[in-house]
Structure formats: C-alpha cells, structure tokens
C-alpha cells in the first residue's frame, strides 16, 4: 500500500496540462455546442413537440457538463496558486467565455419560464429526472429580466463581482503571518496560522489571532471597499432590478427555501441566544477561565496527547468511512489515490 503524502492536487484528469491542445479543443467544442443549440430557438413554441423538448434539455445537459469541466480546471488551479499569472489569465478567459456561452443559450430558460403552467406541467410530467430542475427554473420567473438585460448582467458580473472576488483572493492569499513559537519567529500561511488559533496554548492562540487581524487590517480600507462594492452590486441587481422582497430573498430562492422558513430560523435563533451564551460560559469553565475571550472560542477543551502524520490520519479517516459504509470508503480512497486532495502546505 502506498504512503499518503502532503502534495498539491493533480488536475490531469481534467486536462493533461494548462497549455496543451486539449484545453483549446474544449473551448472549440463548447463554442460549437452553443452555436448548434441556437437552432432550437425556432422550435421553442407553446406547442413544442415532447421529443424536441427533451432533445433541447439533453443538449443543455451535455453543454453544461462540458462547461463544468472547462471551468473547473482554471478554478482549481487558481485556488491552489492565486499568485500564478498563468492561472489568473486562463481563469479570466474562461469566465469571459462562459458568459458568452450562457448568453447564446439564455433563450431556452427565458422561454421555459414564460410557458403557460398547463403546458409546462404536461412536459414536466414526462421529463422524469429533469422535473426538479425544470420546476426550480420556473420559480425565478418573477425576478427574470428581458433577454437583452440578462445578457448585460452576465457580462457585468464577469468584469464586476467575479473580478472583485478574484482580486480579493489574490490579495489575501499572498499574506505572510509571523508568530513567535517556542522562542523562534516563524512565517506562516493562513492555513498554518489557523492551527495555532485553534490550538491548546492560550498565549499562542491570542498571538496568532491578533497577527491574523493585524495583517488584514493593513489592507482594511481596500478590502472594505471591495466588500461594499459587492454589497451594492447585490442590492442594485436583486432589489432594484429583479424586485426581490429583501436582499436575503435572492439567496433563499437559490437554496430553494421560502423566506418564511429562513425568517423562522433567524427569529428562533435570536430568541434562544441564551443557549449559545450558556455554551460559552460552560466552555470557559472547562478551560479554567473566568470569561471566554475571543481567542478561546475554538480552543480544545482537552489537550491532545497524540500526534499523527498525514498518512496515518488519512488511513484513520478511511477506516472510519469503512465502518460507516464500504462504498463511501472506496470513493474517499479514490479521491486520495487519484491525487485529488490539495494537502500541501503553502
């Protein structure tokens, strides 16, 4: 049995390389799918034939699968190395291309949302596994704009909020944190610092926590402006243009949750805040503290007396999955064996 080691993930199962012909072929193939799909526009009438309807759905499904593969590669590459100019360039190119493809195929979802309820139900009743997807699409009808407006928003998002998030990741992932450990100053990534934030040493927890926010505070005005930009964009689109009842309503609909359900959850959480407060008091007692500090929220209540290397930790995890369900363990093991875990510290 091979030993599991801390390694970056392999993306070879998506594409062999970032600059190989396979990626360019994927762009060409998806572009052709989008162009071919436009032929369905003239078939989308109130009296559409069921076979034509299912052909259109399967064409959307095939294009969506291809788009996910093409979009996942640069997304994972960028997530693993946010400072790579090549990763950023490909990521931006794919996002722009996806907006173009979405705009070419947008007419299908707009037509489907506008179709009369009786006709839509007749088609959904025969659509088997596609029914939930079709129903969900129609729930967005009251908040859908014209085709021209939706196209503008797709383009706006690429160069607006998506670009802001990419910029935020690029800025914050270059941060280096410095903490004194055992009398020696060490440089750490955020992931490494988080171990100290959640560690058993109260002084190290405090030092790590303060260092985390010291570094972020240096860029506070910049990060704050980016956050405000995203908030304004969300409100302008979802309240002013799409007419949602509240900013959270747009997210609730995406999550297939009625506003009333989320409101009840929030209301009950507020009314029972004392449960959370009692938990903090009890944890402070377990830690031997008069009052829980901000640095102690994630502190373990007992010191760990064992350490495990990565290989041992993986095998313990797989063993637990095996006890739960052998099939789950098999799938989890495949993720590790295929190099789909990005475990390298950096």
Language-model segments: which ranges?
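A well-structured
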Residues: 1-320, 324
């Amino acid at each position: 049995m091979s030993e599991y080691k801390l390694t970056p993930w392999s993306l070879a199962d998506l594409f062999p390389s970032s600059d190989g012909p396979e990626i360019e072929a994927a762009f060409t193939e998806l572009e052709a799918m989008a162009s071919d799909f436009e032929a369905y526009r003239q078939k989308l009438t109130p009296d559409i034939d069921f076979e034509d309807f299912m052909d259109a759905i399967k064409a959307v499904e095939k294009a969506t699968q291809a788009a996910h593969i093409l979009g996942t590669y640069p997304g994972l590459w960028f997530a693993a190395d946010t400072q790579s100019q090549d990763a950023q360039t490909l990521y931006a190119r794919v996002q722009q291309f996806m907006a173009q493809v979405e705009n070419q195929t947008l007419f299908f979802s707009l037509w489907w949302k506008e179709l009369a309820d009786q006709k839509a139900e007749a088609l959904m009743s025969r659509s088997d596994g596609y029914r939930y997807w079709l129903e969900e699409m129609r729930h967005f009808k009251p908040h859908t704009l014209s085709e021209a407006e939706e196209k503008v928003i797709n383009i706006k998002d690429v160069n607006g909020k998506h670009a802001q998030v990419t910029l935020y990741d690029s800025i914050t992932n270059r941060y280096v944190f410095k903490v004194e450990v055992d009398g020696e100053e060490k440089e750490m990534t955020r992931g490494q610092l988080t171990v100290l934030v959640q560690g058993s040493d109260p002084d190290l927890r405090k030092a790590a926590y303060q260092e985390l926010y010291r570094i972020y505070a240096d860029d506070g005005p910049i990060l704050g402006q980016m956050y405000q930009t995203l908030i304004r964009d969300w409100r302008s689109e979802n309240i002013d243009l799409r007419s949602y009842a509240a900013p959270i309503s747009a997210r609730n609909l995406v999550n297939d949750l009625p506003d009333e359900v989320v409101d009840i959850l929030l209301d009950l959480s507020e009314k029972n805040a004392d449960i959370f407060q009692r938990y903090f008091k009890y944890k402070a007692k377990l830690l031997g503290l008069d009052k829980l500090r901000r640095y102690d929220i994630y502190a373990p209540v007992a010191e760990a007396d064992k350490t495990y290397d990565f290989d041992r930790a993986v095998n313990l995890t797989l063993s637990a999955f095996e006890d739960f369900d052998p099939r789950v363990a098999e799938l989890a093991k495949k993720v590790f064996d295929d190099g789909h875990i990005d475990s390298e510290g950096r």
